[in-house]
């Protein structure tokens, strides 16, 4: 094998030596391509696996933790929620519409492959500076393309996109982040797993035909970008949501039968990863007859068939004798279905082309025992330079308030979420635009499931460990503010180039923060994804661990809103304000800096707040609640009253006026009627949570907070109309 071919497959000299040892000979091109894909960062997690191993993954309500297509938790009365968040960053930067659309398609397949009907989607989007003279126009093009791709796929599938977050920073100028989350619901006893066992059981290919799109996608997503990256468009997959809708319905029909052993979607590395993962998990072997693959293009080779990432395809291990019944279901839905192999006990993948053996590879070294790297780490030099920076107010508080509310990181994103169908399936209780976590009704048991997606990249830049812990806490707090109990998380860890020791240090610290927070807050990790090599021309993104928290409220009718719907409601701040300005939005806007330090998270205070919110809502004491986040109580209150029909007369009583922009954790704003005040304050005392009265909601169309005064019309204009102007 010549060195150029090996290098083109991103195989190092050390890895090639391992290949020779595993095979006992030189690989052919097909085998090299397969091994390259399975050992890519995207498929093998070779740089990250050692740090993920310590994640808390168990709890009495966890049915399935990491290692399957998605995580599963018990949501009561025999029902389960199946969910996962995943990235499609690199493809979305290269081809925003197709990249984002297939990102949605992939995460939907991960969930319905487990036997669940998908009932909700969320997304976390990070773009570069839309005001930048050089790249601002391109960033706006990326925003529009990505949003169009997500809405096209989700809307066509009939899956409501009910929430998300969108942030902008120059660190994403060369690498945008597109993280998609899906949640499905099924009976706890009806979950299907990705396994291939039982010697002689048939392996069946179902779904769309295979083309040349997405070739080398997994390897491409395991590398950084440079000027030549524009030529990678052919590696971006092309999605067809209508085919996926047929595939989902066919699979859900199949799941009502007893015909199959296991099922796996064909995602990154296509037929390669699905076959190796199924056999690897089961300790089996497999024969695949590649010439039987349904092909969309003529003249396709075994190499192309194994590595194509054409969308809307699944691999099924059926019970022997049920092949025709399985195929009949998929044919009914106008999909391809063909027996293309069988399970063996050899522990090897045997690849045939017109009955000739063209590839023979041991499965375990490519799946369960793929190489794990121990990359060097070192603390980034910038941390010592930024940690002592102190934020001081330099402009008028009213000016700063207005600047912040109309900033693209805070203002309303109706331009984005209005393109998503959030009400299809008629289960949505709280969707995007209503602040905080999104909520859906589970008709089968009367409960509701709340979900929130969270990632503050600036905080993770300032302190990767505490920043990651804060993401776990913040997502959970948003769920708690709906009245639900946070139960578990899914994570998507977006970082820079792992070959840079400073990036690996950030990643290791981020994992430590997630481990610590999940353990202390009793929200185990049940699924997730790692996206590395988010770097362009040597510049890495800020560390960006995206966390989705999922929780359950037993009675959907008790779901809390985040808006004040009545006048004369008492407005309270819960929790302590500690003067946290490190990595804050107010510092970024006023000083154009991301600096400072972060205080350790007080987990007892965080849990006490969650427990108080749950109990107070169960006792029907609260009218509304919202987590305090970016921009402190100033922005939290401004947004709550912008989406409300009433005005506000509020006083913070802080000694230092800038404290209204403090971003301390473990805080919430609540609204309650005056007759419930005493009972609530007694309960807060019982839980050890400080409650500070800020004022009341009023019938006057006016917003007042300390010295800040705006008419309701001015407040609404700043919040609701700014982004539409900025993105044009």
From Swiss-Prot:
The keyword DNA-binding does not apply. Mg(2+) 1 binds at residues 86, 529. This is Phosphoribosylformylglycinamidine synthase subunit PurL. Substrate binds at residues 87-90, 109, 237, 309-311, 531. Monomer. Part of the FGAM synthase complex composed of 1 PurL, 1 PurQ and 2 PurS subunits. Pathway: Purine metabolism; IMP biosynthesis via de novo pathway; 5-amino-1-(5-phospho-D-ribosyl)imidazole from N(2)-formyl-N(1)-(5-phospho-D-ribosyl)glycinamide: step 1/2. Gene3D superfamilies: PurM-like C-terminal domain, PurM-like, N-terminal domain. Belongs to the FGAMS family. It is found in: Cytoplasm. The active site is at residues 42, 88. Its EC number is 6.3.5.3. Its main location: cytoplasm. Part of the phosphoribosylformylglycinamidine synthase complex involved in the purines biosynthetic pathway. Catalyzes the ATP-dependent conversion of formylglycinamide ribonucleotide (FGAR) and glutamine to yield formylglycinamidine ribonucleotide (FGAM) and glutamate. The FGAM synthase complex is composed of three subunits. PurQ produces an ammonia molecule by converting glutamine to glutamate. PurL transfers the ammonia molecule to FGAR to form FGAM in an ATP-dependent manner. GO terms for biological process: 'de novo' IMP biosynthetic process. Keywords: ATP-binding, Cytoplasm, Ligase, Magnesium, Metal-binding, Nucleotide-binding, Purine biosynthesis. It comes from Campylobacter jejuni subsp. jejuni serotype O:6 (strain 81116 / NCTC 11828). The keyword rRNA-binding does not apply. One of its GO terms (cellular component) is cytoplasm.
